[in-house]
Amino acid sequence: MYKKALFNFFALFLCCIAYAQTYEIQYTSSSNGKVLTEQSPTLVWANAKENFILTNKIREQKSDYPYEITKVEKPSNTVVSYAFLKLGDIISSPDAESIGKQSFELTNETKKILGYSCKKAVTKINSNTIEVWYTNDLKINGGPSVLGQSLGFVLEIERNKNSLITATSIKQVKKTDINAIIKGSVPSTDLLGYRNLLWKSRFTTLKVFDNETINFSDESKSNENVKKFANGTIILKKIKFPAIKEGENIFVEVKQQSNGDAYDRTGTVFFIPQDKTSSFFDGLEKGAKTLPVYDNGNGKQYYGVTATENYSPAIEMMRFFTAFGIQKFNHIQLKGKDWQTVSPYRQDITELKPSLSEKELWIGAFIGNYDKGGHKISLDITIHKSDQTVYKNNTVIPLFNTLNIMEMAGQDYSTMFDKDKGLFVEFTLKKDLKNAQLRYITTGHGGWENGDEFVPKANSVFLDGKMTFSFVPWRSDCGSYRLYNPASGNFPDGLSSSDLSRSNWCPGTVTNPNFIPLGDLKAGTHTIQVKIPQGASEGTSFSSWNVSGVLLGSQ
């Protein structure tokens, strides 16, 4: 009896020791055989009760926000994710199902890792082949991710034969630092909400407009947050930009719905430079005719479209075109057509960084329409950390913008290309400009069969009198966006209006800029000229071209 009791005591004692043992495992990552030295090693603390997955930088509390720590509770295999969004802001979310849903093909292959006998299991996730090497020698389960936690202790994971995370050291420790990192109770949220908050914490969002109306009505008035001009077709808000560092990317995003207007309309997102004595804002407040006039010799006057010594035109961030009646006219039924409810427009505008960083600017949006219901839009500008540096320019110089943003306040359509002179701008550089580019956005308009909207026309750009670039702007993919266009008219030939190819735009899309290389420009006076063989008018129908140009480079 005494010996049996003694045996049970020692068995229980050894079990408690095993239960209390905590291992610390370090892992390194590699890609195509090269160790990713810039990546902090993965760190795992594991015992029979729970596992924690983090990195050495997180352990040292030197990691940039946001970052995550993963906890696996045993024996339930519940995954608790902790997101550190910013200093003092931590959230968590439990997941009791994901580990149990994992499936593996167990193989007979074996190998040794750090002296431990390991077996291989294989799984596929989102078309990726994952090989997991695990051991049962440690008598506990764990690993550098949640993958394979039910197999044993994972010491190596290989993805698609080119990406590898492998254990480099294993040791027993008496205690961990986890209580110094996760302190006290942490608020919990559902998994979808957790992922959304974590994702949004990875970048900076500047909220410009939230479900604002752009319409045509005498009742459209400014308020303390948003200014409205031209009977509500233009909305403006002053936005303070933070310092935007090298390597950070900037995106503009618009979400648009019809609020009564069924037609495809020209839209633009712009900002107003205030680097000269006169700006586009003066025209909004005092009238278009207070802005500098451009005369091409056709008898018309075009206000505020070209830069002068004392005036900078509005800089176009994004040109977009509304779809035919999205959301408001989704009651129109066609068999096999499930209409989209929102038109999303999103564009990288990182090249404009030098004119945005640490500036307080008027940001505006315009949709040309004469409808009292008009359109609803939301506008965000987001700033993202990135290792990708595509645009290295430190200079942004606005040269021209012929899009008649103040159309409903008397600004004429851009029909100046009916003369050979076209658009002509003179500008002066105070310093040499290296790697100069013209950021050029162009769309042709005139919505009848012979109008320039539906007739390809060459755009030719001349620098200091010499043609430097010529191309035919044309979009032939408009039919791809049919489901955004419920109110698009249908023709006897089986096509719909939104299917038709156009001069560089489609209903429901963004028009991308062209980046035209100009080489190195010396300090002094230069000229830019744009020529387009604009089609002749027919009765009351006429063609026009909306072109905007910004000079980029480094000084």
For each feature predicted by the language model, list its residue ranges.
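Bacterial Sec-dependent N-terminal signal peptides
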Residues: M1-Y27
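Secreted/luminal cysteine- and crosslink-motif detector
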Residues: C16-I17, E24, K119, G479, ...
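Generic hydrophobic-segment detector
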Residues: F10, F104-E105, V455
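Extracellular/secretory-pathway and virion-surface proteins
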Residues: I181-Q555
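Sterically constrained small-residue positions within well-ordered secondary structures
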Residues: A11, C16, V35, K112-L114, ...
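Residue-level marker of positions within ordered structural domains that often coincide
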Residues: F7, C15, D137, Q172, ...
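Extended soluble regions of mature proteins
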Residues: T22-W199
